């Protein structure tokens, strides 16, 4: 593979994470406008966005097999067509059923693209470089989460229709489409007919189970925590909307800075050991936040939490890809699917807890989930295969 082709494939991966981040995080910015557009209460409108998460989950799960049947390039080109149709449907459709269908299609496109982007990074890069590259790729999710809410706020403040926000997000897929046309993709499964020695199927091992549980609990814990921080800060400490929102902003800012830092630092550490340390520190920082009696300390704790937890999820995925000698798209997508399930379960799990016991109980539950992540990382240390396969080398 030429260096120029490797760079193009890497940028496709970057943009794939940015696309998913923009679609998921911008939801809160446009929900009120969409509810007004359809003349529905915002509580009812929020349920329709489940179609977006469902589309992401279904496509990531199925693409573990589809990647070996349908060429990656063809999938991305077809995804561009679906993206255009979905955005057009949002613009011309004035029906809630059409809106829900378009959200599902956007989720499918996003999930397919992100699963391909993740596989490309795990396929192109090896050893510790794989972890640092995947972490830098994941930072584009957060960057999109910072940039597109600003774009959305600017457009909505100028009374521009909400669907133009999704048209702006579509520009990311336009970049993916252009890069796709210029790139050569690795062939998988039956497509790889040129290989003289077919790759022997490898057993995943129990380590993948530990990693999958950790990925699900991490995402569920993270989103369950950050979604209820504003409510907790307002009720417990009497913070204003601006102050409680600032806590969330501090978390994501520190999270992105942490991603950039660890994308370099991870090259010098064994991934299983460092993710165990980070999980322990994250559990401790979240405990300090949840148990703090001083509102002035909350910003410091949440900044620390965002920084030390930023590398956990992508490191779990990287370790998963290293449990086999040759990176398996099915294995990577399985761990991604578990993380996506955690996303979908966020309000299913935390909603009843908040209704029954308040936001503090939801944060305490998230803290418990982070503790589970730490335990899974410790158990992984006894069974991991990444050192056996030589992936621990620089």
From Swiss-Prot:
Mode of membrane association: Multi-pass membrane protein
Single GO molecular function: transmembrane transporter activity
Gene3D superfamilies: MFS general substrate transporter like domains
Primary location: membrane
One of the record's GO cellular component terms: plasma membrane
Bilayer-spanning residue ranges: 11-31, 51-71, 76-96, 101-121, 134-154, 160-180, 206-226, 246-266, 274-294, 297-317, 334-354, 363-383
InterPro entries attached to this UniProt entry: MFS (IPR011701), MFS_dom (IPR020846), MFS_trans_sf (IPR036259), MFS_TsgA (IPR023528), MFS_TsgA-like (IPR050375)
Pfam families per record: MFS_1 (PF07690)
Keywords carried by this UniProt record: Cell inner membrane, Cell membrane, Membrane, Transmembrane, Transmembrane helix
Compartment annotation: Cell inner membrane
Family annotation (PANTHER family): L-FUCOSE-PROTON SYMPORTER, PROTEIN TSGA
HAMAP family recorded: MFS_TsgA
Similarity section: Belongs to the major facilitator superfamily. TsgA family.
Protein known as: Protein TsgA homolog
């Amino acid at each position: 593979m030429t260096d120029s082709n490797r760079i193009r494939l890497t940028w496709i991966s970057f943009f794939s994470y940015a696309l998913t981040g923009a679609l998921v995080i911008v939801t809160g910015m446009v929900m009120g406008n969409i509810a007004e557009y359809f003349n529905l209460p915002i509580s009812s409108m929020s349920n329709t966005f489940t179609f977006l998460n469902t589309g992401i989950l279904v496509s990531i799960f199925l693409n573990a097999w589809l990647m070996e049947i349908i060429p990656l390039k063809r999938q991305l080109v077809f995804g561009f067509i679906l993206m255009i149709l979905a955005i057009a449907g949002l613009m011309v459709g004035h029906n809630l059923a059409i809106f829900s269908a378009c959200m599902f299609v956007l989720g499918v496109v996003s999930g397919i693209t992100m699963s391909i982007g993740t596989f490309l990074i795990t396929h192109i890069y090896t050893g510790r470089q794989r972890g640092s590259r995947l972490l830098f790729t994941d930072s584009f999710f957060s960057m999109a989460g910072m940039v597109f809410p600003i774009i959305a706020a600017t457009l909505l403040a100028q009374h521009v229709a909400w669907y133009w926000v999704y048209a702006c997000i579509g520009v990311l897929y336009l970049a993916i489409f252009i890069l796709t046309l210029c790139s050569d993709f690795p062939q998988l499964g039956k497509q790889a007919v040129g290989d003289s020695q077919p790759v022997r199927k490898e057993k995943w091992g129990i380590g993948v189970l530990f990693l999958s549980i950790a990925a699900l609990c991490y995402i569920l814990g993270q989103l369950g925590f950050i979604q209820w921080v504003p409510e907790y800060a307002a009720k417990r400490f009497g913070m204003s909307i601006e102050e409680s929102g600032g806590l969330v902003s501090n978390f994501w800012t520190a999270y992105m800075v942490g991603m950039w830092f660890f994308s370099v630092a991870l090259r010098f550490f064994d991934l299983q050991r460092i993710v165990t340390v980070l999980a322990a520190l994250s559990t401790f920082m979240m405990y300090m936040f949840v148990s703090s009696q001083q509102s002035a300390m909350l910003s410091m704790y949440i900044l620390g939490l965002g920084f030390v937890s930023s590398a956990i999820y992508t490191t779990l995925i990287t370790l998963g890809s290293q449990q086999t000698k040759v990176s398996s798209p099915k294995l990577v997508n399985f761990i991604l699917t578990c993380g996506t399930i955690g996303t979908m379960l966020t309000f299913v799990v935390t909603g009843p807890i908040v209704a029954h016991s308040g936001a503090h109980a939801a944060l305490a539950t998230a803290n418990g989930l982070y503790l589970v992540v730490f335990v899974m990382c410790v158990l992984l240390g006894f069974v991991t295969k990444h050192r056996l396969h030589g992936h621990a080398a620089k």
